[in-house]
From Swiss-Prot:
Cofactor annotation remark: Binds 1 Mg(2+) ion per subunit. Binds 1 thiamine pyrophosphate per subunit.
Gene giving rise to this polypeptide: dxs
Catalysed reactions listed for this entry: D-glyceraldehyde 3-phosphate + pyruvate + H(+) = 1-deoxy-D-xylulose 5-phosphate + CO2
Record's protein name: 1-deoxy-D-xylulose-5-phosphate synthase
Keywords annotated in UniProt: Isoprene biosynthesis, Magnesium, Metal-binding, Thiamine biosynthesis, Thiamine pyrophosphate, Transferase
GO terms under biological process: 1-deoxy-D-xylulose 5-phosphate biosynthetic process; isopentenyl diphosphate biosynthetic process, methylerythritol 4-phosphate pathway; terpenoid biosynthetic process; thiamine biosynthetic process
CC annotations in GO: cytosol
This protein's record includes keyword DNA repair: no
Binding site for thiamine diphosphate: 78, 119-121, 151-152, 179, 286, 368
PROSITE patterns: TRANSKETOLASE_1, TRANSKETOLASE_2
InterPro entries in the cross-refs: Dxylulose-5-P_synthase, THDP-binding, Transketo_C/PFOR_II, Transketolase-like_Pyr-bd, Transketolase_BS, Transketolase_C, Transketolase_CS
């Protein structure tokens, strides 16, 4: 638990208590809450900049609205630490993102105040609209609020929801948390006044009455519209959101409770869809995070008095870094290469690429569907697109992957980071399904590198193909096998035998382990005790059919191993291939179970799934009890 004293915050166990506080006390509470968030995250790691930026907004929302009766729907959800603290989870913040602890995102099973589970972006308006209309159908009177960031607002899904919500007859409030701009002091007071004015009942009624009165007089009506637009234009950009049917209010200072609370109070009395634009600053109140919000977006544990400190020892190369180096090297070799990311420059390892090749770098925003089809369009004109995307986010562009890329057999490379389990971010970010959902697509190739060296080589192999290929690799570092300097690839669709069975005279079942990806190394460790053959398959599609037949015919049983969903995964591909060839062998499929695996230490989570060396040995011994397991 944080060691600093937070006397007022320690009296708040639910928002009903917060609603009893006077405005001056709320300001004290916000200051303590910000300090608590900083101290907590410094001890556990987690998302920091975004949470420091939403403290006052969170306090104001819970103060004005009768949560949990009124629904707050957070977009993405990594900015909800203050929300969690104020809704009864303060004493559990020391378990944040740890196995058995509270999630770093909203989860319906964790609290009644978490009205909608989330971690991917741009879902809040759709969910909130559904809740608002469902409440109306039941005759329930409640307010529904979607809180969405400016980055998430760039996604098509958000605009689809706005388009629907603008014509829906319900009381929905969309709060745009804009943390990519600032309010200058001279404008702030006027903003506050106009926001309260525009959110007032008199303004809304007068605006609607004026439209009714002036409708028979088009010239006067047009003049009135232009005057209103010019008046708003003093403090806001041209408001697209009113074209969707929303009453636009703001922008207002998202760190000023004297602006937020009366404005939200006024909005509660309005009918129909409302849109409140608040401006916040990432890292607010912690100078180091304010100066570098990207570095403090998701830090590991650190000392708040010192800030982030680079390790004195050189860390092992990560798969993300391997990709970033390969991308720059291949771009220098082939000017056709273009790099595309849906707002994941840092996470996907594209910072150096952007710096060295700015005219070939495309950040399309949080828009995975667009990213995939954008790449397809570039490929049509002779470019060689490489789409750097997390495995879990490619799910959002699946139709485009099939219809726009694979159906037209376009040479697009998908670099799938965070394949498999991801640790602290939990089930929402796990890349558990890519093998299953990619291998069923015609024309698609899928590579599974075992280590850093193979990652670079298989990226080159994928790039050399004239059809779409994905290369999946896990978060963090691998076995420590240094990549080779060149750009040579490995044979497409071909694996290798990494360990041959040694005891040929044994009567025990002859076992072969077929490893896909980085689990090759625990497979090799397990094989020493089992005297099993180990095959590094490298490709989930196409499978190395010739090698598979050779291994199957020389062994009594096969074990497939993958850090992905068992159902429909690489193991399924093996059994399908053997069945089609008429080769009858028992196949033990090891991988991720048919459950959503929550947050925790990655190594411990893999062990719980039986995907470490000990678990592999135990599973094989249990399935094939006649085998001689060396101890």
């Amino acid at each position: 638990m944080p060691s600093t004293s937070f006397p007022l915050l320690e009296t708040i166990d639910d928002p009903a208590q917060l609603r009893q506080l006077a405005r001056a006390q709320l300001k004290v509470l916000a200051a303590e809450l910000r300090g608590f968030v900083l101290e907590s995250v410094s001890r556990t790691g987690g998302h920091l900049s975004s949470n420091l930026g939403t403290v006052e907004l969170t306090v104001a929302l819970h103060h004005v609205f009768q949560t949990p009766h009124d629904r707050l729907v957070w977009d993405v959800g990594h900015q909800t630490y203050a929300h969690k603290i104020l809704t009864g989870r303060r004493e559990r913040m020391h378990t944040l993102r740890q196995q058995g602890g509270i999630s770093g995102f909203p989860q319906r099973g964790e609290s009644v105040y978490d009205t909608f589970g989330t971690a991917h972006s741009s879902t809040s308006i759709s969910a909130a609209l559904g809740m608002a209309l469902a409440a109306k159908r039941k005759g329930e009177s409640r307010h529904t609020v979607a809180i969405i960031g400016d980055g998430a607002m760039s996604a098509g899904m958000a605009f689809e929801a706005l388009n629907n919500a603008g014509v829906a007859d319900c009381n929905l409030l969309v709060v745009l948390n804009d943390n990519d701009m600032s309010i200058s002091p001279p404008v702030g007071a006027l903003n506050r006044y106009l926001a309260q004015l525009m959110s007032g009942r008199f303004y809304a009624a007068a605006k609607n009455m004026g439209k009714t009165v002036l409708r028979p007089m088009p010239p006067l009506l047009e003049f009135a519209k232009r005057f209103e637009q010019q008046a708003k234009g003093l403090v806001v950009p041209a408001t697209l959101f009113e074209k969707f049917g929303f009453n636009y209010i703001g922008p207002i200072d998202g760190h000023d409770l004297d602006s937020l609370i009366p404005t939200l109070d006024n909005i509660k009395g309005l009918q129909g869809p409302q849109f409140l634009h608040v401006v916040t600053k990432k890292g607010q109140g912690y100078k180091l995070a304010e100066a570098d919000p990207v570095a403090y977006h998701g830090p590991a544990r650190f000392d708040p008095a010192v800030g982030l400190v680079k390790s004195s020892t050189a860390p092992r190369l990560t798969f993300t870094q391997v990709f970033g180096q390969w991308l720059c090297d291949m771009a220098a070799h082939d000017e056709r290469l273009v790099g595309i990311t849906p707002a994941m420059r840092e996470g996907s390892g594209m910072v150096e690429f952007e710096q060295r090749f700015p005219d070939r770098y495309y950040d399309v925003g949080i828009a995975e569907q667009h990213a995939v089809t954008f790449a397809a369009g570039m490929a049509c004109e002779g470019a060689k697109p490489v789409v750097a995307i997390y495995s879990t986010f490619l799910q959002r562009g699946y139709d485009q992957l099939i219809h726009d890329v694979a159906l037209q057999n376009l040479p697009v490379v998908f670099a799938l980071d965070r394949a498999g389990l991801v640790g602290a971010d939990g089930a929402t970010h796990a890349g558990a399904y890519d093998i299953a959902f990619l291998r069923c697509i015609p024309n698609m190739g899928l590579a599974c590198p075992a280590d850093e060296r193979e990652c670079r080589q298989l990226l080159s192999s994928a790039y050399a193909q004239n059809h779409p290929v994905a290369v999946r690799y896990p978060r963090g570092s691998g076995a420590g096998v240094a990549p080779l300097a060149g750009l040579d690839g490995l044979p497409f669709g071909k694996g290798e035998i990494r360990r041959e069975r040694q005891r040929q005279d044994s009567n025990a079942p002859r076992i072969a382990i077929l490893a896909f990806g980085s689990l090759l190394y625990p497979a090799l460790e397990a094989a020493d005790a089992l005297d099993a053959t180990v095959v590094n398959m490298r490709w989930a599609k196409p499978l190395d059919d010739a090698l598979l037949r050779q291994v199957a015919e020389g062994h009594d049983a096969l074990v497939t191993l993958e850090e992905g969903a068992i159902m429909g995964g690489a193991g399924s591909a093996v059994t399908e291939t053997l069945n089609a060839a008429g080769i009858l062998r028992p196949v033990l499929q090891l991988g991720l179970a048919d459950i959503f695996i929550e947050h925790g230490d990655p190594a411990k989570l893999l062990a719980m799934q039986g995907l470490n060396a000990a678990g592999i040995r135990a599973a094989i011994a249990a399935r094939f009890p006649a085998i001689d397991v060396a101890r």
